[in-house]
Amino acid sequence: MIRFARATCVAAAMLVAPLANAADKDAGDVDTFARYAGTWKMQLNYVESAHSKARVESMTVANDCWRSDFFYVCNQIIDGKSRALIVFFYDPVAKRYGSYPIAVGADTVHPATVVVDEKSITFPYDMQDNGKTVHMRIVNTFTTPETLDFKQEYSEDGQKWVTMATGVEHRVSPKAK
């Protein structure tokens, strides 16, 4: 699921009042991430590409999640081991979604933009490859409330996308086990 996932919710004193007013209207937008809660069985198929090796991966991903105001937080447990704490947020002033994925053992936390629509959640990010920026994205398309299609892609120009991996996830429990 969200394995590579990677802005900010810092308000200056002058923004506190507008933010509070926006909270009444827009705080519910963070609920879009509630669809990740629960335990999922995942099957991924990677292809040989410039940024991936051909392989098949299977895993169980349990997302133990909760909501607090503008934040939706998930402890992501992969095959029984806690691997990351992902803090999703909605900024009603900027009208944008983002996340702070905190991986176990990581020295830094990198804020990430998250693109949300009715059927999908996309996690775009960039990486460096020999001094060249490569655009990456993970796209989760919810085909039913209990199933999502996974796709990981890269692009050297931000226009033409090459698929690195595809897969499917099935929710097996509404709660993390």
Residue ranges and their predicted role:
Residues 22-177:
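Hydrophobic small-molecule pocket/channel-lining residues, especially in calycin-type beta-barrels
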Residues 12-15:
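Repetitive helical segments and hydrophobic/amphipathic motifs
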